[in-house]
Amino acid sequence: RETKHHIQCCYMDNRLGVFNALKVAETLENGIICFTCYEEHGGGTVSFLQRFIQKKYKVKQALISDITWVTEGVKDGGGVAISMRDSLIPRKKYVDRVIELAKQSSIPFQLEVEGAGGSDAKELQMAENPWDWIFIGAPEDHVHTPDEKVHKDDISAMIDMYAYLMKHL
């Protein structure tokens, strides 16, 4: 379902992360976009790909594309959410760099600190050669229900922020 300001459907959680990556891929000139599956049911593919990408391309940082929850501090329509922490804590120097670039971009964003939840970043952080990573996602209401809802402006901000960061990191 679509209204003037929102898109609402089931299973938008993972789909929005993929949609974001595909939109960024349309204009990306230099970077890697990597899709993995099975992470919520055992994992392992992220760490395999991480070793290959780091060895071949010397990449050691990642942006994790997904959604986050609309909460008291993360507002619907307030811009893409940059997570300073979920079940893991990304390296402060990398978080600070991303926030600095986000401010320079003039793209609407909001900061969040999650008390729970997580992402595939665990595989990146716990690896033999850890990467810098940060989770950035559009705030979603009614997560994991048939009525997941995201503000269109937050989706646009998410796509724009990823494109900007991929160019400037």
Mark where each language-model region is.
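Active-site-adjacent substrate-binding region
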Residues: 81-159, 165-169
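Acidic/histidine-rich catalytic neighborhood of metal-dependent amide-processing enzymes
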Residues: 1-10, 15-85, 117, 121
